[in-house]
Amino acid sequence: MKQLTGAQIRQMFLDFFQEKGHAVEPSASLVPHEDPSLLWINSGVATLKKYFDGRVIPQNPRITNAQKSIRTNDIENVGKTARHHTFFEMLGNFSIGDYFKEEAITWAWEFLTSDKWIGFDKELLSVTIHPEDEEAFTIWNEKMGVPKERIIRLEENFWDIGEGPSGPNTEIFYDRGEAYGNDFSDPELYPGGENERYLEVWNLVFSQFNHNPDGSYTPLPKKNIDTGMGLERMTSIVQDVPTNFDTDLFMPMIGATETISGEKYRNGDLEKDMAFKVIADHIRTVTFAVGDGALPSNEGRGYVLRRLLRRAVRYSKKLNINRPFMFELVPVVGEVMKDFYPEVLEKKDFIAKVVKNEEERFHETLHDGEAILAEVIAKAKEEKTTVISGVDAFRLYDTYGFPIELTEEYAEEAGMTVDQEGFENEMEKQRERARAARQDVDSMQVQGGVLGEVKVASEFVGYGTVATESNVVALVKNGEYTDSLQAGEEGQLMLNVTPFYAESGGQIADRGYLLADGVKVLVKDVQKAPNGQNLHKVVVEEGTLTKDAAVKAIIDTKNRGSVVKNHTATHLLHQALKDVLGTHVNQAGSLVTSERLRFDFSHFGQVQADELEKIERIVNEKIWESIDVEISQKAIEEAKEMGAMALFGEKYGDVVRVVQVGDYSLELCGGCHVDNTASIGIFKIVAESGIGAGTRRIEAVTGKSAYELMNDQVGLLKEAAGKMKTNPKDILTRVDGLFAEVKQLQKENESLAAKLSNIEAGNLTDSVMTVDGVNVLAAKVNVADMNNLRTMMDDLKNKLESAVVVLASVNDDKVNILAGVTKDLISQGYHAGKLVKEVASRCGGGGGGRPDMAQAGGKNPAQVEEALAFVQEYVKSVSK
């Protein structure tokens, strides 16, 4: 067996399958862009679903990839076991209806055992198969020469995730030797059992059935291969180390942590070893996730990152690290992964800034949170309970930023548990935000549909043409082929030549008409068909449309003209955002319509008003410079060398379309654009907002829409100036003057209210009653708010010197209640807080406060008199 680095194993795997005719699929972003069912990309096949379910036909049915992945369903096990990770790489080879079992098994065996590749000793490999998969048994036994005693039949060797492709699988195991297990009485000591000796190297899934919605299984029209090999586990075997953490994929981070902490890994302290592992794992995950656009927050993906960072900081204390340090490990991760993921080093400064910011925030609250938790645990032990209440756990989460998982880990160390149900009840809406994570499900659609069978060519000519003669080459109604569509019917069609742009890259589809003698067809929408053709959604307005009919295809040029202005403006906006906010800004989504543009981008803070103004000014300056927009076809590598921005979630071929706006903006883009920026006219931002963790949104208008917006705003300004009897240019001065007048009137009103309050307080002293020797005043008064009520209370307490006073007022069906007790009566047991709570409860409210002064509110004005009558009862109850 060769001595290889993790990076060499990854590259060797891809090279091997490239030699076998596979296309190398780039590793996709960890943040899914096409699959709303996933929180993270969590497997090698997750990004290929569109191929397996037939929505998209790949150029090459043989695919291989090394896909970065995140799984967070067992975070608490990371560091405790040899192979649990939150971030990992899955190496895979896939066949979309091409080769099947024999090739998959043969190639796997060749890669693992050939001296040209990994070079495993064949005698150390065993396999598992499904009990009924005789074909796999025959291939392994007769062709590969694996003895039948090393071919183990297991019922669980069937891959099934619900609806969609399913089938038997075979797994390959490597025997690491007796040092990892030699007790043959152990029922788990076999390939496929829970043990450290026989490690799974590779899982080959043979997708040959559709699991239908009714629970039945039918053969797939096209059989598929889906395989997965964990790079970290494979590296641990090749490098002959006890755990994945001891490989060169993790040791640089562990080594850097040793330097920072002064502690040593594998120095006989298992708790410290666990801390090293947790830190190494979590910094890999956070580094890659932030690099792909996720940012720490209290919801969804952001909550996962926050939880991982805070868990790592908590474990760092076991290594005597009491300062932010994780950010220092970001460039270490970048160096380890630079061969295949150079973007990590390119973004290291931004990633480190995000990590450091989050660490600093947590350190600010961690000390207080730990102290409070220690008190909670001590109190629970005094009360002889082993449960931390949900209320206390929630207070730690809400006030001190303590993730519930950390509270649970601390509790476990103290031999206690947390009342999870109570915590969840306390979370209410906050819990919904924190847990608003989409489920890590992994499902595919059932294969089928006639559109995937349509191979006929369709040429898009809409970049330079708005109308063209064409022929209907495919016609579909209700999911089935048809020869015609009658007036009033809807359907889908393909043209051999089309000027209609299919929705993609954020740009909406063209609309327009297909015309022929006696036939008028409205084109409502255009999308990409599975094999890449433009698929037109149509309604026949007049006549009958037939397959093979000759038509004139005409797009709505007014609509297209507005769309292209907005699309080119998004390119200018993207670059302006980078110029003003920083190079960390990346497009996270966009929508380009004829009315407006919407641009989503990564940024971990609100865009300030002065920044928005600067961004808007830059875009308009580029418009007014009348810059030519040049579009060219380039080899992908040449385009990247030019500095063209490639966008997350987009797939690019070997030749790409480059859109260049002078020397200012350079992007890979398949959309439609203006010829010169002057055509855009003007650009106006209408809104900026946050739409999720670390993602901001700008909405803007251009051209006619921008003119109409500003014209409306000028109209409103003139109308407002008219109402204020001034000129638009003087309106700010007039507004300032009005504010000053209002402020003066408020001051005069408060002075008058205080005088009236003093007068009314004097009149109220005549209503004082004596109850068991105590002066008691309970009255409904006419004051505007709680402030006036307090002023009156102070006057009454000063005048009466010794009294229990309760005042109530009603404004807009809202009841304000204030209770006061003079100092001499507090010592006798009278308590304003307790009294006001009882009074408020009798008119549908609640409240409380100090012994001398307390306030409350009520919801039922009709019950105020009855509530005030209780004051005498209260005084009597205390005097007893």
UniProtKB/Swiss-Prot annotation:
Gene Ontology cellular component terms for the protein in this record: cytosol
EC number: 6.1.1.7
Cofactor note: Binds 1 zinc ion per subunit.
Presence of keyword Translocase: no
Origin superkingdom: Bacteria
Catalytic class of the enzyme: ligase
PROSITE patterns, per database record: AA_TRNA_LIGASE_II_ALA
Required co-factors: Zn(2+)
Full protein name: Alanine--tRNA ligase
Organism: Bacillus thuringiensis subsp. konkukian (strain 97-27)
Lineage: Bacteria, Bacillati, Bacillota, Bacilli, Bacillales
